[in-house]
């Protein structure tokens, strides 16, 4: 919790720097600033917290002893930390539960709007009900801009939001938003004219029956904390709101409902511009390729090959890298030998070292080939990783590969360097450890 408080102080300081610049440049008075959180405090840290949230995305439970051993590293480069869900509950007080639930603990957020030259009141609170989708309509309304119905001949989707501008001008005006629909990982909610119906789907259980979920009812105009479930007293109101939820879900294309685990969600192929294929070619000196668009080597055999020219014994650096400290793999040259590392969810660096010096020459193929021969839960492929100079095997070892994404965001695929955080601590000077002493062709 202290780490997150420290980061918030850091964010506050840098927002202040932006405000100072706007003030100094004479733009502050006529600039609308909107500051909003993205959801309630998050409960993904589980009961014991986590020093490596990537475990959760890969279906691997945390170990409290490992967490305690890393206590002094929290907030540093060696951790991908998350607070325990008890802190999430505390952060959301007086609201209950946390992110991914439809209670106010998961959905109610602060929203600060500042526009000195256009608002008479300063530091005032507004109580109208609004949603994040209302921000863009508010800006357009403020600018007097009507969104186009078509762009370059393509019909645009409708805006779901309504402008909040009226609430800035009139604190006592009734809420312009009358209905708000919620759905996340199978849990559902609907707010309408001061009443809210909520049903909690068993968390990340996968494939449980939605018909078994029980709807609760709260009169949020007088019970913002949602403490008093009135479903038994007003069954007709529950039916009304549930029917409205289904209507809104249809209008918002929310079906089918999805209660898969994070690992299931992240390992299910999604539509992409380039269709999947058996062979991918990448080149050096290009931007990193995001993981969602790069070759997918999860839960399968694969080969990584680099076509290189090596004139002498000075070649060194990364040939290929994907991912980072909390999951990834890399093929690289060190001490004139070929090496491969597979960093399993940040838990273990599995290193395979070449046993022979690199040959010199042109159009050499240096490769690492993984042959899957087994699988451990949850979808962890096991097998033999072999290193080659051309057709000559120069090293091998048994590894296991990561079941889900290497990284939730960032740290894509690179050729000739390792961008961001290094996949391994075996690089002499850390990342990017660019390849030198030779030429990578592809």
For the regions a language model picked out, list residue spans one by one.
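Loop/turn elements at helix/coil->beta-strand transitions in domains of secreted/extracellular proteins
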Residues: 27-33, 175-177, 192-195, 236-237
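Surface-exposed acidic, glycine/proline-enriched linker/cap segments
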Residues: 58-94, 286-289, 411-431
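Extracellular glycan-associated modules
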Residues: 256-442
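Secretory-pathway/luminal and periplasmic proteins that interact with or process carbohydrate-rich
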Residues: 40-48, 170-177, 392-397
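C-terminal cap/loop subdomain of S1 sulfatases and analogous C-terminal strand-loop tails that border
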Residues: 77-107, 118-128, 133-220
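Short, solvent-exposed loop/turn and secondary-structure capping segments
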Residues: 19, 31, 43-57, 122-123, ...
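A long, amphipathic alpha-helix that forms part
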Residues: 1-31, 41-43, 47-88, 368-370
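Flexible glycine/proline-enriched surface loops and loop-helix/loop-strand junctions
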Residues: 1, 75-78, 92-96, 115-124, ...
